[in-house]
A protein has these predicted regions:
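Hydrophobic core of transmembrane alpha-helices in multi-pass small-molecule transporters
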Residues: 28, 110-126, 317-331
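Helix-to-loop junctions at the C-terminal end of transmembrane segments
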Residues: 69-81, 277-290
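Primarily marks hydrophobic transmembrane alpha-helices of the MFS/SLC 12-helix fold
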Residues: 86, 294-295
Length: 425
């Protein structure tokens, strides 16, 4: 009785690992395309005559699009499975990246950039909802944090590659060359997914309607989503959107690069740190059997990093701030997604992930629209200092929400052979 089940269990585990690797590879290559635009567009806006507010709107357009697309994408996953939305979403993102090339050579660059970012948002809503659902499908309580961190890390490792290429290649070979390379990477991601990613989710009735308001309003989804909002607002919405302007204003540079190239390097440091700690945070929360200690620790790390950003005036201090902010954001990401999956029934998993993405996109989308005009009027210090408080507030909210849901301040995680408590019971 023991032999065959163990063999099947080992084969299943190997298959699950292969699925995770395939999703990581696909999200890495499409993440590259997403990173290219960040170090280019804020500076390119001045050259093309695009106002700071409109630049912020363009950078945020993909996230605001996902506000509408995230919930239907999650519902679609619960009803139709993961493979098709994942492949289609990656393909849409590849086509959207090609829109950057059209924008630079167009007489209406702002319009084309905006359309490309909207299309990117539709594709990424499908990709994120499916990728996280796949991670939940092939995981249990003992591996969920690690797998969530690894899959999220696929996007993250692709993103700094895009940041570096976007900043450096555009400086030496031109903006169009950087966008062409990004397009090739993004389209390759869709081909990779088509060849390697199988169906993992239980299919529902594909004839049912998919509505933008079909969201998960459970306490765990709202609590985790709010934490995701605060981290996304500070990390993507403020720091990344304003970094190139911060470097130019304070005359900080690295490797002899200008503000645009240097911002790509600093962003890459931040995101590589995030990617490393995504895996470590998820792994630690799996091994300890508790998500909350890891989450709260890394929220404090985020606070320290953002505080350093507010006072940074040299390359060493700014580099340390980037490492800490990245570590804090990454360290919370895997355990946070795993915590949501721990507390969500399988039949609602796609909607829960979609709802969580809505909150993150509100934060990341609202940030540039608020931060770019604010730093222009009041300076960087007040904006960065205010952002530093957000992770602490998020930690307090997380403790309250999880205690109300589970009756414990630090509930244990379900482990397949460890006999610990199931969070969803």
């Amino acid at each position: 009785m023991n032999g065959p089940p163990d063999d099947r269990s080992e084969a299943t585990a190997d298959g699950d690992r292969a699925v995770v690797v395939a999703v990581i590879a696909s999200t890495f290559f499409v993440g590259f395309g997403g990173g290219v635009v960040f170090p280019i567009l804020p500076n390119l806006g001045a050259v093309l005559g695009i106002s700071p507010f409109l630049v912020g709107l363009i950078l945020s357009a993909n996230r605001f699009t996902r506000l509408v697309a995230n919930a239907p994408a999650g519902t679609l996953v619960d009803r139709a499975g993961t493979r098709t939305p994942f492949v289609v979403g990656l393909t849409v993102q590849g086509v959207a990246t090609a829109g950057y090339i059209v924008a630079v050579n167009s007489g209406a660059p702002a319009t084309w950039f905006l359309l490309a970012r909207v299309a990117w948002g539709i594709g990424s809503a499908m990709v994120f909802a499916t990728a996280y659902t796949i991670a939940a499908d092939v995981s249990d309580g003992g591996t969920r944090g690690t797998n969530m961190g690894l899959i999220r890390g696929g996007v993250i490792f692709g993103f700094p590659t895009g940041l570096v290429v976007g900043g450096i290649v555009s400086e030496f070979y031109g903006t169009v060359a950087a966008f062409v390379v990004a397009t090739v990477f993004a389209l390759f991601a869709s081909l990779l997914a088509y060849l390697l990613v199988p169906e993992t989710h239980v299919e529902g009735d594909p004839r049912e309607s998919v509505r933008p308001w079909d969201v998960d309003t459970s306490l765990p989804a709202l609590t985790v989503g709010t934490v995701n909002f605060t981290v996304g607002f500070a990390y993507i919405g403020v720091v990344f959107a304003t970094l190139v302007l911060f470097l130019k204003t304070n005359d900080i540079s690295v490797l002899g690069l200008d503000a645009q190239g240097s911002s790509g390097v600093f962003m890459a440091v931040t995101v590589v740190s995030a990617a490393v700690f995504m895996f470590l945070g998820g792994y630690v929360s799996d091994q300890s059997g508790r998500r909350m200690p890891t989450l709260l620790t890394f929220l404090v790390v985020t606070f320290v990093g953002l505080s350093l950003f507010a006072v940074a005036s040299s390359v060493p201090v700014l580099s340390l701030a980037c490492v800490l902010v990245g570590a804090g954001q990454g360290g919370t990401s895997g355990p946070l997604m795993a915590l949501l999956a721990d507390l969500t029934p399988d039949e609602r998993m796609g909607r829960a992930m979609g709802t969580n993405n809505v909150f993150g996109d509100v934060g990341g989308g609202l940030g540039p629209m608020v931060s770019l005009p604010l730093v222009d009027s009041v300076g960087f210090l007040p904006v960065y200092a205010a952002c530093a408080v957000l992770p602490l507030a998020a930690g307090g909210l997380l403790v309250v929400g999880i205690y109300r849901e589970t009756g414990e301040l630090s509930p244990r995680v379900e482990r397949p052979r460890g006999g610990t408590e199931d969070l969803s019971d």
